[in-house]
């Protein structure tokens, strides 16, 4: 009887051990797998965009392209480098030594640079209309170029886009500097007009007039582009970059134009995205800056961009610009305009 109990107890223990060690039929064991590999991030090619001004809402299309990942989608990471216009062209011209692949600059500056032997070329135009304006208080007539005759006109100095706009207006109106009084006032145009130090001043159409209106001053504005349009701002690169890495140029332009299209379609979103690239100390009045962006939009598109696509460069405009610059003495010799720009990288342009 005792042996039977011991035997029975032993069998129960064996059954219990077997049951505990058996796999649960409702939860099959998974096959062993390797540890998941971390998501591999693509390596982005870093390129520098030399910008001819301080961080500013006028660069919104490039900021939007960066913020929305359009550059990254093309495999590039853009570094924004701020400096002066002459310097950015010099640096772009000496790529790859300078490390600057792209530069924001005007068509007038490209023509001047090429006369000096710098092998630079515009590959994308942002401003289809020259963004300079003559402005005055509302009691000063400013309906046409003829209203400039006999006026005192305040300009920052005899250099840069404002000076070129003045010379172009006089050229278009059949006048010379003898027909006006030019007063160099530095970059104080807004205050100079508000305080009646000069009746007329020249500045950026989306800047000084907007500031005056924001302070309750009614202004008359004469757009330089309505008098004599000039080749304006876009992206310039060296001929060496085009020859050695045209695909990089194509990628940068394509991403930038996506940013431009989004900015035009949704300027409020573009403004908000741009704020992360502009130091707070340089922002100033946000409502004013928002208006600056809004005023910029019409300058970035026209009937040619509707036909050929955003970023298109108008060859006829460049030809007229070169002819004016020679007549005004800004260029001492002819410049081959067809070598100064290309539309090959602009979708819709000539390939």
Curated annotation (Swiss-Prot):
It is found in: Cell membrane. Induction: Expression is probably regulated by riboflavin, via an FMN riboswitch. PROSITE patterns: PROKAR_LIPOPROTEIN. Gene3D superfamilies: Periplasmic binding protein-like II. It comes from the Bacteria. One of its GO terms (biological process) is thiamine biosynthetic process. The keyword Transferase does not apply. A lipid is attached at residue 20 (S-diacylglycerol cysteine). Keywords: Cell membrane, Lipoprotein, Membrane, Palmitate, Signal. The keyword Cell membrane applies. Its main location: membrane. It holds the Pfam family NMT1. InterPro entries: NMT1/THI5, SsuA/THI5. Part of an ABC transporter complex that transports riboflavin into the cell. Binds riboflavin. Belongs to the NMT1 family. The complex is likely composed of an ATP-binding protein, a transmembrane protein (RibX) and a solute-binding protein (RibY). This is Riboflavin-binding protein RibY.
């Amino acid at each position: 009887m005792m042996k039977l109990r011991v035997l029975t107890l032993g069998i129960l223990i064996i059954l219990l051990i077997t049951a505990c060690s058996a796999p649960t039929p409702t939860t099959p064991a998974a096959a062993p797998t390797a540890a998941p590999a971390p998501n591999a991030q693509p390596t982005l090619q870093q390129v520098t965009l030399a910008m001819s001004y301080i961080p500013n809402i006028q660069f919104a299309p490039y900021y939007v392209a960066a913020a929305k990942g359009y550059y990254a989608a093309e495999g590039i990471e853009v570094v924004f480098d701020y400096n002066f216009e002459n310097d950015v062209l010099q640096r772009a011209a000496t790529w790859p030594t300078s490390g600057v692949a792209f530069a924001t600059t005007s068509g007038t500056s490209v023509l001047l640079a090429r006369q000096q032997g710098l092998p630079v070329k515009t590959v994308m135009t942002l401003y289809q209309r020259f963004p300079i304006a003559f402005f005055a208080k509302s009691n000063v007539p400013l309906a046409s170029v003829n209203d400039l005759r006999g006026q005192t006109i305040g300009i920052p100095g005899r250099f840069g886009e404002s000076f070129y706009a003045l010379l172009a207006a006089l050229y278009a109106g059949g006048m010379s500097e003898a027909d006006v009084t030019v007063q160099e006032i530095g970059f104080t145009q807004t205050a100079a007009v508000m305080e009646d130090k000069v009746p007329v001043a020249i500045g950026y159409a989306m800047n000084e007039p907007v500031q005056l209106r924001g302070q309750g001053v009614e202004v008359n504005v004469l757009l330089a582009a309505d008098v004599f349009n000039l080749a304006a701002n876009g992206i310039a690169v060296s001929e060496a970059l085009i020859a050695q890495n045209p695909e990089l140029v194509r990628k940068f332009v394509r991403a930038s134009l996506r940013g431009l299209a989004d900015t035009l379609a949704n300027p409020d979103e573009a403004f908000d995205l741009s704020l992360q690239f502009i130091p707070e100390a340089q922002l100033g009045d946000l409502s004013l800056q928002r208006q600056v962006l809004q005023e910029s939009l019409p300058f970035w598109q026209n009937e040619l961009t509707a036909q050929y696509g955003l970023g298109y460069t108008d060859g006829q405009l460049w030809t007229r610009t070169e002819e004016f610059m020679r007549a005004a003495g800004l260029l001492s010799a002819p410049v081959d305009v067809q070598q100064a720009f290309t539309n090959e990288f602009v979708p819709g342009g000539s390939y």
